[in-house]
Swiss-Prot record:
Keywords: Cytoplasm, GTP-binding, Ligase, Magnesium, Metal-binding, Nucleotide-binding, Purine biosynthesis. Belongs to the adenylosuccinate synthetase family. Transmembrane segments: none annotated. The active site is at 14 (proton acceptor), 42 (proton donor). GTP binds at residues 13-19, 41-43, 306, 332-334, 415-417. Plays an important role in the de novo pathway of purine nucleotide biosynthesis. Catalyzes the first committed step in the biosynthesis of AMP from IMP. The keyword Ligase applies. One of its GO terms (cellular component) is cytoplasm. The gene is purA. This is Adenylosuccinate synthetase.
Length: 432
């Protein structure tokens, strides 16, 4: 039996993690976000009602679940308050269910200004960030000049630290990026107005998780983005600024690494990517348009159209290696309904003619790669809303089996629609 279960994306994000976390937290006592920020977009559909969460863990809708934002998350006070208000307006007592690590770095207005200014300066080489200040906040953390939630306990010292760091960043904005300076007093006033709310939710997360482990409580760790966007293992520099992989759980929450019991990799039945960066199986034809339309592939956070393509088993195998995946949850299988044939990338043909079955790391090394496809029959029957494996078309079952063969990982959960009820749990991670 696994008490500590990690749910993370195996591709470039947008795999459908939010729904699965919400579903599995029926048995959990805690749900923990351990990396990223409000650049995430987790969509939940419960009894037909849609909820999009960016910063607050997906367990917040569960009455008996405590949601935790761990130290690996960069926290925007403004974004958190906006999200809290939206939920509280619907009668959800967020402040009774949400806890924060005092070590969370804060995202403030100058981080957003820097993010936007840098993307503009990059021009055609823009990374495609969400413009929410995520990267600059992580930079401040690593440079040891960042302000954290815990700094708000001493408001006078916080004000002094803020003044110093803003002088540094405003100098960059004005003199290098030719942008407007950010107003110090406004930033200070905005943060001070909600400081007590934030500090009132602070807890020692590492100790809490250790006590939960000793009691045998079920804990779910909710990843954001996807493995191939990891700052170290992704398609650098077209990556996010945090560790999206299973290793980020320990560093981003304070859980001891030996205590992770099961790692569930969310894998979409095809591939998508938002923003710039390598994408070997990207489709520019009518099939790509079909996947985009049928899958409603528009970002929950930015509204940007996602790039679409066939499933890339080579890239997913890299995710299997890095995360030591225990099992897959296959999502959006229903989007492939009606296609006469489906393809899986099983290798890459390099520019020099070599055939390889592993992914490069640096983005430059992906240039000129051609995907090697395996083609399988599609299916005309609908898989939407099917709740038993026996109800799936044989061609769909063959597709699932081939994914398992190519990756060496079992498909333990199959999602056939956006609602939490439209799911087959073949093996529950908490029972594995």
């Amino acid at each position: 039996m696994g008490n500590n279960v990690v749910v993370l994306g195996t591709q470039w994000g947008d795999e459908g993690k939010g729904k699965i976390v919400d579903l599995l937290t029926e048995r959990a006592k805690y749900v923990v976000r351990y990396q990223g920020g409000h650049n995430a977009g987790h969509t939940l559909v419960i009894n037909g009602e849609k909820t999009v969460l960016h910063l607050i863990p997906s367990g917040i809708l569960r009455e008996n679940v405590t949601s935790i934002i761990g130290n690996g998350v960069v926290l925007s006070p403004a974004a958190l308050m906006k999200e809290m208000k939206g939920l509280e307006d619907r009668g959800i007592p967020v402040r009774e269910r949400l806890l924060l690590s005092e070590a969370c770095p804060l995202i403030l207005d100058y981080h957003v200004a820097l993010d936007v200014a840098r993307e503009k300066a990059r021009g055609a080489k823009a990374i495609g960030t969400t413009g929410r200040g995520i990267g600059p906040a992580y930079e401040d953390k690593v440079a040891r000049r960042g302000l954290r939630v815990g700094d708000l306990f001493d408001k006078a010292t916080f004000a002094d630290k803020l003044k110093e760091v803003m002088e540094y960043h405003n100098f960059q904005l004005v003199n290098f990026y030719k942008a407007e300076a950010v107003d110090y007093q406004k930033v200070l006033d905005d943060v001070m107005a909600i400081a007590d709310i934030l500090t009132g939710m602070v807890v020692d997360v590492s100790d809490l998780l250790d006590q939960a482990r000793k009691r045998g409580d079920f804990v779910m760790f909710e990843g954001a983005q996807g493995t191939l966007l990891d700052i170290d293992h992704g398609t650098y520099p077209y990556v996010t600024s945090s560790n999206t992989t299973a290793g980020g759980v320990a560093t981003g929450s304070g859980l001891g690494p030996r205590y992770v019991d099961y790692v569930l990799g969310i894998i979409k039945a095809y591939s998508t990517r938002v923003g710039a960066g390598p994408f070997p199986t990207e489709l520019f034809d009518e099939t790509g348009e079909f996947l985009c339309k049928q899958g409603n592939e528009f970002g929950a956070t930015t509204g940007r159209r996602r790039r679409t393509g066939w499933l890339d088993a080579v890239a997913v195998r890299r995710a299997v290696q890095i995360n030591s995946l225990s099992g897959f949850c296959l999502t959006k299988l229903d989007v492939l309904d009606g296609l006469k044939e489906v393809k899986i990338c099983v290798g890459y043909r390099m520019p020099d003619g070599r055939e390889v079955t592993t992914t490069p790391l640096a983005a430059d090394n992906w240039e000129g790669i051609e995907p090697i496809y395996e083609t399988m029959p599609g299916w005309s029957e609908t898989t939407f809303g099917v709740k038993e494996r026996s109800g799936l078309p044989q061609a769909a079952l063959n597709y699932i089996q081939r994914i398992e063969e190519l990756t060496g990982v079992p498909v333990d959960i199959i999602s056939t629609g956006p609602d939490r009820t439209e799911t087959m749990i073949l093996r529950d991670p908490f029972d594995a």
